[in-house]
């Protein structure tokens, strides 16, 4: 409406309240036409997706996670088809729990490949780290070290093995795990 009024030659004169508050059909058509044009359609790489899904399905057991990921893939396809903004509709942050050797790291790697194939991630690579890879021994260095690992993982997956170890030693003046957690949470909110 504002653009229509600004482009109208008659707007050089004083406009009435009615003119300023009237929305025309053309205004609405323009707004929705513009929003349709701005919708992002993900490019899905069907070959990469099939390979990643096959790799997931070859894993022994884990039927629940396989079903969850399959349903997520179908939902992302559906949203992409109807023009919903897939990238901002989902939180891709996940927590994998389980005993050692149950495949958490393997599933995280495969999920990165699936998200890349779906066009959600640029690179789909997995950066694996643990407490030692995030926490430094001096004040102020942990945030820098953690941010560096996060930057390395951008466009892919950051997998923090035994992330609970970041909370160990809470309250100790020599423990910087809380600083790493704060840095991670801030970047998760921002990116």
Please provide the spans of the model-predicted regions.
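The conserved phosphate-sensing helix
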Residues: 1-7, 63
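Walker A/P-loop
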Residues: 89-124, 148-154
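Conserved C-terminal helix/linker of AAA+ ATPases
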Residues: 5-45
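Hydrophobic positions in the central parallel beta-sheet of the AAA+
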Residues: 94, 127-129, 158-159
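Conserved Walker B
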Residues: 131-132, 162-164
